[in-house]
Every structure is written in structure tokens, then in C-alpha cells.
UniProtKB/Swiss-Prot annotation:
The modification N6-(pyridoxal phosphate)lysine is found at K303. PANTHER family: AROMATIC-L-AMINO-ACID DECARBOXYLASE, GROUP II PYRIDOXAL-5-PHOSPHATE DECARBOXYLASE. GO terms for cellular component: cytoplasm. InterPro entries: Aromatic_deC, PyrdxlP-dep_de-COase, PyrdxlP-dep_Trfase, PyrdxlP-dep_Trfase_major, PyrdxlP-dep_Trfase_small, Pyridoxal-P_BS. Homodimer. It comes from Cavia porcellus. CDD domains: DOPA_deC_like. Substrate binds at T82, H192. This is Aromatic-L-amino-acid decarboxylase.
Length: 480
């Protein structure tokens, strides 16, 4: 493909993408395929000779689209949203064209410097404390990670290195292995599974703190666990507080947990993967109160801030905590400015070496939507969630299982877990809308999350009528 054909095919692809998104609600939101459907549709090995673009694009509809779960459909109400916007897609195209691997300032100055500025822009939108901003000469700063899972792992590994060095400075006879076997980290029992995985990868105990009646981690439960573990000779060093849990969008109490972490010299990491986007709205910013106690903070613009995956924003108060844990300087990566104090080499802030020019997406989206446009997007989703909540409350057969704070509604039929499992199977088998469940204590609960950029009140109303009809059918069968 030469430049001339690329121009022509590129315009065709833009038309295809625009048509796909404009007509997405006419497609089944959940694919009607079985595991292994794709392999018989394609050859068993790559072609020896080039194939035509026409053949490839024809196979998109024949092979790929039948197996796609359409996350951007206005009838997709599962998981959490994946952000999507035309400015972000255009920026991703440019990112692919530039195709730099921005592991250091020298590898691509613009890639590095735009990321630093965009994380400061976003930090100011969230009204983060100045300590988290790079500014002109700040000690903290932001970095784009691939996911919240990566951010949690990076924070845990940095905290682990920091506590080991602190203890060895006080007691040089202590070995790293002796310290490691006593380290213990904490999170709520509502924390995402990636938090437990970070403990597994980091080789440390991860203890889950029982949450309260609102599914939040509180000071009393954390303090009890700390005292018990210290009495047993363990070394508490790391706490993950979740703002907007995956199950039900509950919020750990930063104002309670934060001071304990500071008093005990434990690293506090905040995981706000989903909810963090909402903090750009003044009416939701109070949910972040207590962030000043944290050592690191993370959320995913790629969930709710119209920036396509992947883009997970992470800030730290002390950049040296990350650099101290990850810095390696082989001669082939060194450059003349690295010790100047004027630049950032992001390879020392993350686990991989390579990194894409992801800040372009943020730059395009922030400029083309503006803060007000992004706030309007958040507020629309929250309003639609409350609309769905109101519909559920009007039907006495159903119950709301958790206060609706942002864009997630947790609900269920009154009755057994089996009844609700049957209802969910009916919903997803019909493929008109897509939902996923959660467990809240011993209850099987349905999650209804407003996800699509294109979702409107009509889609919510249609989804509710569909759920009600299926519920009536399930209840009739139960009584039969």
C-alpha cells in the first residue's frame, strides 16, 4: 500500500467507522456465536502472497463483526464504560503514524513533555493537591499507565522498595528476604481483583478488610487488622483505598483511612479507576476528599472521559519513589539530558520499557470538548442512572441494593438468588441489552451501568421495559 492508496483507503475506513457507530444500535449488542466460531472461517496459516484490501475489509463484516460485543452500543449496560470519541480516534491515528516508542525524553521529547503537561491539566481539573503536579519544579507528577491494574502494581512495588530500604537503613543486618516475608498490604473486601493480583505478583501478603454496611472500608476495621498483624510481628506497609468499587460503586473513607496510613508510615494508594472521571464535576469532588493523605492516585480516563483505551492516569507525590524502585540505566538508553534535572524519563515510572504517544488522545479530547463538555457527558450518564433507579423503584417486584451515586444502579428481583440468575440469563440470551452481575454479601445482584456515549433516555426506557417483561415471564414460571 502506497501513500496514494492509503489516502483512499483511509477515507473509506473513516466512513466505515462513522457508519458503524451511527448504526451501532441496530446490531445485536451481544454476539450470537459459540466458542471457537472464528477459526473455521479463516485459513490455518498466513497467506504466501498479498491479498487485496477489498478482501480484508469484506471479512470484517463476515468474520469479525459477528463475534464483537458492542461496548459502544446504547444497549450495553455491562461492566463499566469504555470511553470512545471521534477526537480520540483521530489522535490514535496520528499516534500510530508517528509510531515513536517514548521510553525517554530523548526517544521523543514531544511524547514525554506533552504527557507531563496533560497529567498536570487533568490533575488541575480534579483539583488535586499541588504536591501531585509536576509544574515547573514539583517533586510529584503524573504518568499514563496501561491500566489501573498496572498502576496498583507499580504503587505496591514502589512502596515495597521504599519500606525495605527504610528498614535496612535503620537495621543494616536485615536482609531483603527477611523483610519481605513479614510485609503485609491491605484493601477492602470490595477491592478489584487486580489488587489481590498485585499482592501475588509483588510476593507480599494482601489482606482484605471487611467493609461496613455501605460496602466501605472504615478506620476501625483497618486499625483492628493493623494492631493484630503488628502484634504477630508483621510489617504493614501498603493500603489500597477504592473510590467507586466495581461491584456497587461504594467509596472507602479516605478521611478515616488516610490519617492512619500517615501515622503508620504506610503507602496509601487510591484506586478510582471508574469514579475518578466524575471528580471533574464540582458536585462530585467531595468524594475525593482526603486525597491529600495519599502517596499515589489513579483513575482511568479511558473509562468515562471520552479518551479511548488505553489511558490510565496515575499521580505520585514523590517521583523519586517510583524512580528509586524501577531505575536501570544501560548505556544504550542513556542520553545527554538525563541528569540535567530538566526532563522526565518515563521508563523509570512503569514496568514496560516501550510506551505509546497516548497523551495525544488527551490533548485532542480536552481541547475539542473542553472541561464543560466533559462535565456534561458525566452529568448526562448520572442523570440517566437516576432515571433508571426511579423506574426500578416504581415496580414493587424489584429492589435497589445500593445508593446510586454515579452511573451504576444495583438492583434485583425480590426473592432468591436463583430467580435473579435466571432473569440475567434471559436478559443476556435475548441479546437486546447486555448486563453483568455482582455479589453483595450473599445476594446475587444485577448491575445496570450507563456506558455508551450515545445512550439516551429512550434506550434506558426500552431496556427497563424489556427487563420487566422478562421478569414477568420468569416469575410466572416460578409460580407454575
Amino acid at each position: 500500500m502506497n501513500a496514494s492508496e492509503f489516502r483512499r483507503r483511509g477515507k473509506e475506513m473513516v466512513d466505515y467507522v462513522a457508519n458503524y457507530l451511527e448504526g451501532i444500535e441496530s446490531r445485536l449488542v451481544y454476539p450470537d456465536v459459540e466458542p471457537g466460531y472464528l477459526r473455521p472461517l479463516i485459513p490455518s496459516s498466513a497467506p504466501e502472497e498479498p491479498e487485496t484490501y477489498e478482501d480484508i475489509i469484506g471479512d470484517i463484516e463476515r468474520i469479525i463483526m459477528p463475534g464483537v460485543t458492542h461496548w459502544n452500543s446504547p444497549y450495553f449496560f455491562a461492566y463499566f464504560p469504555t470511553a470512545n470519541s471521534y477526537p480520540s480516534m483521530l489522535a490514535d491515528m496520528l499516534c500510530g503514524a508517528i509510531s515513536c516508542i517514548g521510553f525517554s525524553w530523548a526517544a521523543s521529547p514531544a511524547c514525554t513533555e506533552l504527557e507531563t503537561v496533560m497529567l498536570d491539566w487533568l490533575g488541575k481539573m480534579l483539583r488535586l493537591p499541588d504536591a501531585f503536579l509536576a509544574g515547573n519544579a514539583g517533586m510529584g507528577g503524573g504518568v499514563i499507565q496501561g491500566s489501573a491494574s498496572e498502576a496498583t502494581l507499580v504503587a505496591l512495588l514502589a512502596a515495597r522498595t521504599k519500606v525495605i530500604r527504610r528498614l535496612q537503613a535503620a537495621s543494616p543486618e536485615l536482609t531483603q528476604a527477611a523483610i519481605m516475608e513479614k510485609l503485609v498490604a491491605y484493601a477492602s473486601d470490595q477491592a478489584h481483583s487486580s489488587v489481590e493480583r498485585a499482592g501475588l505478583i509483588g510476593g507480599v501478603r494482601m489482606k482484605l478488610i471487611p467493609s461496613d454496611s455501605n460496602f466501605a472500608m472504615r478506620a476501625s476495621a483497618l486499625r483492628e487488622a493493623l494492631e493484630r498483624d503488628k502484634a504477630a510481628g508483621l510489617i504493614p506497609f501498603f493500603v489500597v483505598a477504592t473510590l467507586g468499587t466495581t461491584n456497587c460503586c461504594s467509596f472507602d473513607s479516605l478521611l478515616e483511612v488516610g490519617p492512619i496510613c500517615n501515622q503508620e508510615e504506610m503507602w496509601l494508594h487510591i484506586d478510582a479507576a471508574y469514579a475518578g472521571s466524575a471528580f471533574i464535576c464540582p458536585e462530585f469532588r467531595h468524594l475525593l476528599d482526603g486525597v491529600e493523605f495519599a502517596d499515589s492516585f489513579n483513575f482511568n480516563p479511558h473509562k468515562w472521559l471520552l479518551v479511548n483505551f488505553d489511558c490510565s492516569a496515575m499521580w505520585v507525590k514523590q517521583r523519586t519513589d517510583l524512580i528509586g524502585a524501577f531505575k536501570l540505566d544501560p548505556v544504550y538508553l542513556k542520553h545527554g539530558h538525563q541528569d540535567s534535572g530538566l526532563i522526565t524519563d518515563y521508563r523509570h515510572w512503569q514496568i514496560p520499557l516501550g510506551r505509546r504517544f497516548r497523551s495525544l488522545k488527551m490533548w485532542f479530547v480536552f481541547r475539542m470538548y473542553g472541561i464543560k463538555g466533559l462535565q456534561a457527558h458525566i452529568r448526562k450518564h448520572v442523570q440517566l442512572a437516576h432515571e433508571f433507579e426511579s423506574l426500578v423503584r416504581q415496580d414493587p417486584r424489584f429492589e435497589i441494593c445500593m445508593e446510586v451515586t454515579l452511573g451504576l444502579v444495583c438492583f434485583r428481583l425480590k426473592g432468591s438468588n436463583q430467580l435473579n440468575e435466571t432473569l440475567l440469563k434471559r436478559i443476556n440470551s435475548a441479546r437486546k441489552i447486555h448486563l453483568v452481575p455482582c455479589h453483595l454479601r450473599d445476594k446475587f445482584v444485577l448491575r445496570f451501568r450507563i456506558c455508551s456515549r450515545q445512550v439516551e433516555s429512550d434506550h434506558v426506557q426500552q431496556a427497563w421495559q424489556h427487563i420487566r417483561q422478562l421478569a414477568s415471564s420468569v416469575l410466572r414460571l416460578e409460580r407454575a
